[in-house]
Amino acid sequence: MVKIRLLSNAENCFSAFESSGHASGSHAGGGHADFGDNDGKPEKGGNIVCAAVTILLKTAVLSLSSAQKESSSLKAEIRADNPGYLSAKITAFSGDDKPRLQYLLEFLTIGLMAIEAEYPDCLDLQIE
């Protein structure tokens, strides 16, 4: 199961996310057993839930990286310590960064809630 904590601040701006784990089960691969090796692990990209979550979170990370280049006030700490783990945390921002951070929160909330609604056994989303 993929576990994600999505955090916002008092101004309804994106604050952080932490994602860990891998989706598993028959629904996670669209009903197909896509096993790429004898260890029973799915092939990279063979799990629709992992792929969808990865695309959303990596897009968020790319957006933050791009925003940091455009804004001297926006600072983010991004970690990908091991396979199946990704986190991003805003460490500094200004009022000019708020619209982008509010949109990023909305983007992640809508996308991740849609995945969780369709695959509740594969994604555990906590929004705080």
List each language-model region with its residue ranges.
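A short, conserved beta-to-alpha structural element at the edge of catalytic cores
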Residues: T59
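N-terminal intrinsically disordered, cationic/polar leader segments
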Residues: M1-I48, L62-E128
